[in-house]
């Protein structure tokens, strides 16, 4: 070994001697880091590590000064990673070493120098001492029942195969039952004669202690009086008799349950067979406990139990409108779904999957569906699930096995026809334990789930009466799972909807939660709008509810602190006092017309945004540069806009070779925020034309639309959110693709009235409305 520095692992409960092969369980972070830092030696293609004893057993994170300097250089034979972030390694102790320059922050590391054993000059004397030690160990092993017979056989085999006195001494020392400090002292001793005499002394001491302990135990047993033995046996008989009576009563209860429950034929036969097996078992055996747990689980399921579900779509619609503002299309589809269920007790159509950003009401919609159907609601959280057994259950052969989560939820709600929410179905993953998404296929398929077999139960259970509804934040689902679902997309709330939700739902809810009396606190509409604009940035209303709660608490504190204050009216002026400085800003129109700066419109998870696009030209080679953390699609859109401009350069009074002398740098501010998508094409093109022709862009005009190389304007998404952002930011005119005119019917009237919305089909129309002057034929 040429390497003089290696990772170092501290041991708490063992001292390893050279020549010994030993298993080690690794669980502490520093030890795992040291293990991960090991590298393959160039000499023999093996990994090596240093191991040493720590001075204090109970020290979880010892310092470098709390480690012994005499250690072992070990070859790593095998590494087995365990599921609970630990590992088991098998090492072969190669040599005893002296440590120096021990360092340890994330993992210990040290320099080392091999310590040779002193030479044995009196071989005959050493042979005599070693033979004596081997005989003493055999005697000790026979006397002391604590030493396992297999260990004795292994040690004797190792000793008989070894011709090296040092190896035999190390083998005996490693199996001595003595303190860790004593073993460490043996390891540090370089004289073979001193080490073997110490081993012999320890063995003699162990033999004397063992014989003394055995004699003492024999004397104590003889001192037990006959009356005490009789009393003990009598009490034991009473306990056994009581246990037998209890077992008979318990088995009778199980038998009665089997007869009374509406089990399927298969389940009843299985239960009777398991009960028959249980009667013949020793009630104290482990197998008896496994069988008893199985029967208890099987009989606790709601076999044949159904809630009286009576669907009234008018009542269901009232419940949905009561609990949710807006979401008209979503509620309409849910009512259609319930209408089919009202006419047919079972639905064979696809499973509903509500997809949308956090906080838009997906979970509460499912609760309202359950209430509207008159069924119990249960939730199965699938986020982070990566084990197939959590869906299908564990087989009985495994220790601690149990049924899957599907049957676990039915057991919890005590009915076979609940509404079950499969929450965060897109957050499942897979690993070596299987793919839970594949396990869900049988659960969600109406043609198969009436014969669902849990691995633990091993009998069929009918899931066809369960209404499964899934939720997800992303539409990126496994193909097979996606095919079994009808996706209903729930977009983020627009500002007006958030205002109505806050005024009609969130404020009353927070007042009720904080026990606010009538007329004690009022929150103005402008204050709520400022909360939405400057203190939250989200698709849903969770953060808005938290901020309203914070406002309520601040106001309540003032009322309770000052008895003269009877009423607090919270308006926009109170927000910074109660909640601190503004957290966010929404985009505003430019203050004046700019050259090379255009206002685009973006659609994000949290709504619409104004997107400023600016450009500069400077001497160069005709290249285009983009900054602002733009995605690949947006970069390609910029290239398309530049190519379209170059092809029309003569239309703007520019020569074909003008652009060759300039580089154009396009930047989209808020550089830390990723931006992507093709809908900024119009704005990018307008920015380049304005820059090169020196014609300003109207500051009150915003635009959205993808462009082609031929200058056509293509449709975009998120029109509603983009128009809302334009109205909020002081924009007067918005240019939209002609193909998006059909989407204007979904835009609130107040938004359409506040904006001049112009449809365009090509970039010439865009430039006509966007630029202060016209560059055509200049």
Swiss-Prot record:
The active site is at residues 679, 722. SMART domains: AAA (SM00382), LON (SM00464). Its EC number is 3.4.21.53. Keywords: ATP-binding, Cytoplasm, Hydrolase, Nucleotide-binding, Protease, Serine protease, Stress response. It is found in: Cytoplasm. It comes from the Bacteria. GO terms for molecular function: ATP binding; ATP hydrolysis activity; ATP-dependent peptidase activity; sequence-specific DNA binding; serine-type endopeptidase activity. Belongs to the peptidase S16 family. This is Lon protease. It comes from Rickettsia conorii (strain ATCC VR-613 / Malish 7). The gene is lon.
């Amino acid at each position: 070994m040429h390497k003089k520095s290696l990772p170092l692992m501290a041991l708490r409960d063992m001292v390893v001697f050279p020549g010994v092969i030993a298993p080690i369980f690794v669980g502490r972070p520093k030890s795992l880091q040291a293990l991960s830092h090991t590298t393959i030696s160039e000499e023999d293609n093996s990994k090596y590590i240093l191991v040493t004893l720590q001075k204090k057993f109970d020290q979880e994170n010892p310092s470098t000064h709390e480690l012994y300097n005499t250690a072992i250089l070990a070859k790593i034979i095998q590494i087995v990673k365990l599921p609970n972030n630990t590992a088991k390694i098998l090492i072969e102790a190669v040599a005893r070493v002296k440590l120096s320059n021990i360092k340890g922050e994330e993992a210990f590391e040290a320099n080392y120098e091999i310590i040779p054993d002193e030479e044995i000059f009196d071989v005959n004397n050493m042979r005599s001492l070693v033979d004596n030690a081997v005989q003493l160990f055999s005697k000790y092993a026979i006397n002391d029942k604590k030493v396992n017979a297999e260990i004795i056989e292994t040690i004797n085999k190792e000793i008989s195969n070894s011709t090296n006195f040092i190896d035999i001494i190390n083998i005996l020392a490693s199996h001595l039952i003595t303190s860790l400090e004593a073993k460490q002292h043996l390891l540090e001793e370089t004289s073979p004669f001193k080490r073997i005499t110490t081993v012999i002394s320890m063995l003699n001491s162990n033999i004397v202690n063992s014989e003394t302990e055995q004699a003492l135990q024999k004397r104590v047993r003889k001192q037990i009086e006959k009356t005490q033995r009789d009393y003990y046996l009598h009490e034991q008989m009473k306990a056994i008799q009581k246990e037998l009576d209890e077992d008979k009563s318990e088995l009778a209860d199980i038998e009665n349950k089997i007869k009374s429950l509406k089990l399927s034929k298969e389940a009843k036969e299985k239960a009777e067979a398991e009960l028959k097996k249980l009667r013949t078992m020793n009630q104290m055996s482990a197998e008896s406990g496994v069988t008893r747990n199985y029967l208890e689980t099987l009989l606790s399921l709601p076999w044949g139990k159904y809630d009286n579900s009576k669907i009234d779509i008018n009542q269901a619609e009232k419940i949905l409108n009561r609990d949710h503002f807006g979401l008209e299309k979503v509620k309409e589809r849910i009512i259609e779904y319930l209408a089919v269920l009202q006419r047919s007790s079972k639905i064979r159509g696809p499973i509903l999957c509500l997809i949308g950003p956090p906080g838009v009401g997906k979970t509460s919609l499912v609760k309202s569906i359950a209430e509207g159907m008159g069924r119990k609601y249960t939730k199965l959280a699938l986020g982070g699930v990566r084990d197939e057994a959590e869906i299908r259950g564990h087989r009985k052969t495994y220790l601690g096995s149990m049924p899957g989560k599907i049957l676990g939820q039915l057991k919890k709600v005590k009915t076979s026809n609940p509404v079950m929410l499969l929450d965060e179905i897109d957050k499942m993953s897979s690993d070596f334990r299987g793919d839970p998404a594949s396990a869900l296929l049988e659960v969600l398929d109406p043609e198969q789930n009436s014969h669902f077999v849990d691995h633990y139960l091993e009998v069929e259970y009918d899931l066809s009466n369960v209404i499964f509804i899934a939720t997800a934040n992303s539409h990126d689902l496994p193909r097979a799972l996606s095919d079994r679902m009808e996706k209903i997309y729930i977009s983020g709330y627009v500002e007006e909807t958030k205002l109505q939700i806050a005024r009609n739902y969130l404020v009353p809810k927070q007042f009720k939660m904080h026990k606010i009396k009538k007329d004690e606190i009022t929150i103005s509409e402008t204050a709520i709008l400022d909360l939405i604009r400057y203190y939250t940035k989200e698709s849903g209303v969770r953060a808005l509810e938290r901020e309203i709660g914070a406002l309520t608490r601040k106001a309540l504190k003032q009322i309770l602190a000052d008895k003269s204050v009877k009423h607090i009216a919270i308006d926009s002026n109170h927000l910074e006092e109660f909640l601190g400085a503004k957290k966010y800003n929404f985009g505003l129109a430019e203050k004046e017309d700019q050259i090379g700066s255009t206002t685009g419109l973006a659609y994000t998870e949290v709504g619409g945004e104004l997107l400023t696009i600016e450009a500069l030209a400077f001497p160069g080679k005709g290249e285009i540069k983009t900054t602002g953390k733009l995605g690949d699609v947006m970069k390609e859109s910029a290239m398309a806009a530049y190519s379209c401009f170059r092809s029309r350069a003569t239309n703007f009074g520019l020569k074909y070779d003008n652009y060759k002398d300039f580089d154009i740098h396009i930047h989209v501010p808020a550089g830390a925020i990723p931006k992507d998508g093709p809908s900024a094409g119009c704005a990018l093109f307008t920015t380049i034309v304005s820059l090169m022709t020196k014609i300003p862009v109207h500051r009150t005009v915003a635009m959205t639309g993808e462009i082609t190389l031929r200058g056509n304007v293509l449709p975009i998404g998120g029109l509603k959110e983009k128009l809302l952002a334009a109205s909020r930011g002081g924009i007067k005119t918005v240019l939209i693709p002609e193909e998006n005119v059909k989407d204007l019917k979904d835009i609130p009237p107040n938004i359409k009235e506040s904006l001049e919305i112009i449809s365009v089909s090509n970039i010439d129309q865009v430039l006509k409305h966007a630029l202060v002057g016209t560059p055509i034929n200049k």
